[in-house]
Amino acid sequence: MKLIILEHYSQASEWAAKYIRNRIIQFNPGPEKYFTLGLPTGSTPLGCYKKLIEYYKNGDLSFKYVKTFNMDEYVGLPRDHPESYHSFMWNNFFKHIDIHPENTHILDGNAVDLQAECDAFEEKIKAAGGIELFVGGIGPDGHIAFNEPGSSLVSRTRVKTLAMDTILANARFFDGELTKVPTMALTVGVGTVMDAREVMILITGAHKAFALYKAIEEGVNHMWTVSAFQQHPRTVFVCDEDATLELKVKTVKYFKGLMLVHNKLVDPLYSIKEKETEKSQSSKKPYSD
């Protein structure tokens, strides 16, 4: 398990975006080998998405051979509703990059048979070869996706009734009116995310400091579902200073002492543009023994 501590939200977002960029470039995806990426919604990943869009526009990264699977979606909201997660992803990320629409997978909260939709989503993940990197965020109560306190730590994609704390937290997106907030959602399970070959969890802000403490310094507990990722062989927690306020000083000092090593994970790699330039130049070289 790695804990990456950056001073500010913007730095944490950039580190996370660089990590995703490097993983995609290292994977070297193509028509016969797609990179599969799990993605969250919410305010936390917005900075990361903006940096990824920047890398694409600069010619440093392509999403042409990337398949995405989103964590969750509300039940009952039309796809084009401004607060649906489908709208969120397209407005904040997908429409700004070169990903093919058929390669984006978001649960349908208006499906006739909701559990069948969840089962089909699991099958699509399997058919894609599993998730290479699942990126997630958490709530102040440590929930990941809509796996709220008390959720099974081996759960799969399913229909979930939302806790009142979540409904209250989400009311700000629905004009502050609780009656407008969906009370159910479709969500990947903790087990679904745990199956990914790698997991990166973004945690920023003082209001999530206690959740980070539960995830890092205490044991695995289904009342804090994020704690399950202590047991994943390749988990990276990325946070800002504010999120570390509940951690012990020696814990923060220990992980900060590893940053010289961890920062090598986001060292610049060849961009798409640089690869094409190198290939073009090598093709012009005269033949020699």
Swiss-Prot record:
The modification Phosphothreonine is found at T161. It is an enzyme of class 3 (hydrolase). Its main location: cytoplasm. InterPro entries: Glc/Gal-6P_isomerase, Glucosamine6P_isomerase, Glucosamine6P_isomerase_CS, NagB/RpiA_transferase-like. It catalyses: alpha-D-glucosamine 6-phosphate + H2O = beta-D-fructose 6-phosphate + NH4(+). The keyword Hydrolase applies. It comes from the Eukaryota. Catalyzes the reversible conversion of alpha-D-glucosamine 6-phosphate (GlcN-6P) into beta-D-fructose 6-phosphate (Fru-6P) and ammonium ion, a regulatory reaction step in de novo uridine diphosphate-N-acetyl-alpha-D-glucosamine (UDP-GlcNAc) biosynthesis via hexosamine pathway. Deamination is coupled to aldo-keto isomerization mediating the metabolic flux from UDP-GlcNAc toward Fru-6P. At high ammonium level can drive amination and isomerization of Fru-6P toward hexosamines and UDP-GlcNAc synthesis. Pathway: Nucleotide-sugar biosynthesis; UDP-N-acetyl-alpha-D-glucosamine biosynthesis; alpha-D-glucosamine 6-phosphate from D-fructose 6-phosphate: step 1/1. It comes from Homo sapiens. Keywords: Acetylation, Carbohydrate metabolism, Cytoplasm, Hydrolase, Isomerase, Phosphoprotein. One of its GO terms (molecular function) is isomerase activity. GO terms for biological process: carbohydrate metabolic process; generation of precursor metabolites and energy; glucosamine catabolic process; N-acetylglucosamine catabolic process; N-acetylneuraminate catabolic process; single fertilization; UDP-N-acetylglucosamine biosynthetic process. Allosterically activated by N-acetylglucosamine-6-phosphate (GlcNAc6P). Transmembrane segments: none annotated. It is found in: Cytoplasm. The active site is at D72 (proton acceptor), D141 (for ring-opening step), H143 (proton acceptor), E148 (for ring-opening step). This is Glucosamine-6-phosphate deaminase 1. Coiled coil: none annotated. Its EC number is 3.5.99.6.
